[in-house]
Amino acid sequence: MQSSSPSTSHCSQIPIKIQHHIAKKRQVRRRRVDLDCGCSYYIHLDCINHGFTHRGVHHCASSNEWRLYLRDNKSPIFHDNQTQPTTIQQQIQFPNISNQVQPQLEEGTGDSQMFSQLPHLDDLTVSDWSFFKSL
């Protein structure tokens, strides 16, 4: 006897309850990270390029972010958490140039070249104003 189903594959579909049961048994791929303050958190292994701040300290969750955070000079594996990093303040040196202000053009009360063709604003009709408002 032929099947009334138009499908050519006659495999049975797994019930949703069974699928959920299998998914609950599957191990979550995550790794535990212990922080210096005594706190710990878990990060999913597929989660990359995410960092966060905890108690005022920025924590990186990816090697790329560590390298950026350490300015590419030291691998995060060899990062020594015992020593306090010295703060390097770079002061930007601006040349001390006095009296070199670029002069501005004076404002005039006459027509500019761009608006010389426009009629006086008092001469505009209601239809002109409605046209401008529709723009």
Curated annotation (Swiss-Prot):
UniProt function note: Multifunctional protein that modulates host antiviral defenses and promotes host attractiveness to insect vectors. Acts as a suppressor of RNA-mediated gene silencing, also known as post-transcriptional gene silencing (PTGS), a mechanism of plant viral defense that limits the accumulation of viral RNAs. TrAP suppresses the host RNA silencing by inhibiting adenosine kinase 2 (ADK2), a kinase involved in a general methylation pathway. Also suppresses the host basal defense by interacting with and inhibiting SNF1 kinase, a key regulator of cell metabolism implicated in innate antiviral defense. Inhibits signal transduction by the phytohormone jasmonate, making the infected plant more attractive to aphids, which are the second host to play a role as a dissemination vector. Acts by binding to ubiquitin precursor RPS27A, thereby preventing ubiquitin degradation of JAZ.
Protein name: Transcriptional activator protein
Motif window: Nuclear localization signal: 17-32
Entry text on domains: The zinc finger and the transactivation region are involved in PTGS suppression.
GO molecular function, one term: DNA binding
Keyword Isomerase: no
Keywords: Activator, DNA-binding, Host cytoplasm, Host nucleus, Host-virus interaction, Inhibition of host innate immune response by virus, Metal-binding, Phosphoprotein, Suppressor of RNA silencing, Viral immunoevasion, Zinc, Zinc-finger
UniProt record similarity statement: Belongs to the geminiviridae transcriptional activator protein family.
Phosphoprotein recorded as keyword: yes
Superkingdom to which the source organism belongs: Viruses
InterPro entries in the record: Gemini_AL2
Subunit and partners: Monomer. Homodimer. Homooligomer. Self-interaction correlates with nuclear localization and efficient activation of transcription. Monomers suppress local silencing by interacting with and inactivating host adenosine kinase 2 (ADK2) in the cytoplasm. Interacts with and inhibits host SNF1 kinase. Binds to ssDNA. May interact with host RPS27A.
GO cellular component terms listed in the entry, alphabetical order: host cell cytoplasm; host cell nucleus; viral capsid
Post-translational changes noted in the entry: Phosphorylated.
Biological process terms in GO annotation: symbiont-mediated suppression of host innate immune response
Chain spans, region Transactivation: 120-135
